[in-house]
Amino acid sequence: MLPPLARIHSPADTIPVRHLHQSIGKSKKPITVVRWTPEGRRLLTGGHTGEFMLWNGTAFNFETVMDVRGQKGDIKYWRPNFNNVETIDDAHHDAVRDLAWSPSDTKFLSASDDTTLKIFDFTARTADTVLTGHNWDVKSCDWHPTKGLLVSGSKDHQVKFWDPRTARCLTTLHSHKNTVTTTRFSRVNSNLLATSSRDQTARVFDLRMMRDICILRGHEKPISSLTWHPIHSSLISTGSEDGSLYHYLLDEPNLPSGQVPTIAPYDSPDPANTPAQVIYPAHRIQYAHSATIWSLDWHPLGHILASGSKDNFTRFWSRARPGETSYMKDRFHIGEEAAEAQGTWSRGFGRRQMREEEEQEAQDEAESLVDQKNTTAQSLPGIQIAPPGLGSLQTGSGSLLPGIGAPQPAPQAGMSASMPQMDPGRLAAILSQQNPSQPQNFPSATGIPGFPMPPAMSGTPPLNIDLAELQKQLLSQGISPQNFASLAASLGSAGLPGLQSSTPDNTYRR
C-alpha cells in the first residue's frame, strides 16, 4: 500500500477504519494523552496516575514505564531515556492541561486550570509572559506553526487568540455553548483552526475571516478530543465521551437523508454572513472504546492513528487493505453483542487476547524492558540504560556477574557445546616458563553481554580446566598461586574494563 503522501488528493483512502492493535499499561489506569515521537518510532502515553509509558511504534510492544507523578502545576523536562533533567516548580497554581511549542522550539505555552496561560523560555526555565483573560479553567492551547499567534480554549466556552509579544488578547470567539476541550491549528493549511467542545460539535475557523466555516455534527455525547491529519488538510478525527471515533472530510458534507444541504461560505457571494456549512462523519467507529477518548494523535507519516481512553486502552487504527470490508462487522463498528451474534468476535477470544497481551508485557519486562525509577543518579556516559544482562551488577559487591558463579550460557551458533580439554600438567609447565605476575591478558570465562570478547579470544571458546588439579601442579613445581589474583576478585576491585570502579551501586537500575 502506498503511503498517504502518494495519494495527496484522495483523503478518503487514508481514513483509519480498521483496528490494528491495542495495548494496555501495567498500571491499567486511564490514558489521558498519546503522542508519537517526531520520527514515529515510538509512542508515548501518559496515564491518569502520573505514569509515562513508551511503546514500540512498529511491533506495538511495551518498552518502558516511568512514574512521574508530582505536585499540581509543576512542569518537568525529560530526556528520551526518561532522565528528569529539570523541574519548574509551581509553574502554575493548578493542574497543567496542555502544552504547545513555538515554531522555533525556544519557547513553549502552557494552559492551566488556574485560568491563565504562560509563555516559558525553554533554556532559562522561566515564565516570560502571563496571559490572563479567561474566567474559568483553560483546557487547551496551541501555537501557530508559522506565525506569532496563540489560541486557547476554556471552560468558559470561549476561544481566544493572543499576541505572544504583547500578551494581548486579539479577539474572542463565542461559537461554542459549552467547555472547549481542544484547539488545534492545521499544520498543512495554516489558515485553519479546529476546535471541539462538550456541546457535541467541532468547528473549523478560517483565520482570514475570523469566523467558523464548518460545523462538524454527529456525536451524541460531548467531544473530548480532536486531531488534524498530518498530510490531508481536509481530514479531521474526533473522539467522544461515549468512546466513539468519527472521521470527517471537510469537502464531503455526508448529510443524513432528508436534511437540506448547506452551502460553504467560500461558494457564497457573501462569505462573511453565510452560515457555516454542516458536515457529518465520512466514517464512524461507534464502539472504538468503551469510555471517553481523551487523546488522539497521528503517526507523522499519516498511516496510523493512536487513541488513548478512559477504558485504560491505547488503540491503533489504520487504513483498510484494498477490497477489505470485514472490518465493518467487527466489534468496534457494530458492538460486542452484534459481533458475537454474527460470529466475528467471541468473549472468550477477547479474554484470551487480554491474557496474551499481559503475558507479552511480562516477557518484555523480563527482557530488560522494565520500569525506570525516578532517581537522581546519572547513567554512565554514552550508556542510557543498563546493557542486557547487567541489570543486577553492583560494583564491589558479591553479586553475580554473567558467567561467574552461574551456569555457562548457551554456546554461540556453530560452536560446539563441549569445551576442549587440556592436561593440567602441560599448562603448569607452560606457565612455569612465563612471568606469572602479568595476568592482564588472562581471558574471562565468558563474554559479558553487550561487550565484545577480548581480541585474543575472538571466536575461541574458553578452556574447561580443573582448577584444583592445576593448583596441585603449580605447587609441585614451586609456583605460588598467590601471584595469580582470582578473576572474580579482579573484577570486583577494578570494575569492568574501561569503566571506573567508582560507579555508584544504583547506576544500573531496573
Swiss-Prot record:
Domain of life: Eukaryota
GO biological process: chromosome segregation; co-transcriptional mRNA 3'-end processing, cleavage and polyadenylation pathway
Keywords annotated in UniProt: Chromosome partition, mRNA processing, Nucleus, Repeat, WD repeat
Keyword Nucleus carried by entry: yes
Signal peptide: none
Cellular compartments per GO CC: chromatin; mRNA cleavage and polyadenylation specificity factor complex
Any single Pfam family the record assigns to this protein: WD40
InterPro entries on file: Pfs2-like (IPR045245), WD40/YVTN_repeat-like_dom_sf (IPR015943), WD40_repeat_dom_sf (IPR036322), WD40_rpt (IPR001680)
Compartment list: Nucleus
Ranges: WD repeats: 26-65, 91-130, 133-172, 175-215, 218-258, 288-327
Protein role: Required for 3'-end cleavage and polyadenylation of pre-mRNAs. Also involved in chromosome segregation where it has a role in chromosome attachment to the mitotic spindle.
Protein name as it appears in the record: Polyadenylation factor subunit 2
Taxonomic classification: Eukaryota, Fungi, Dikarya, Ascomycota, Pezizomycotina
Underlying gene: pfs2
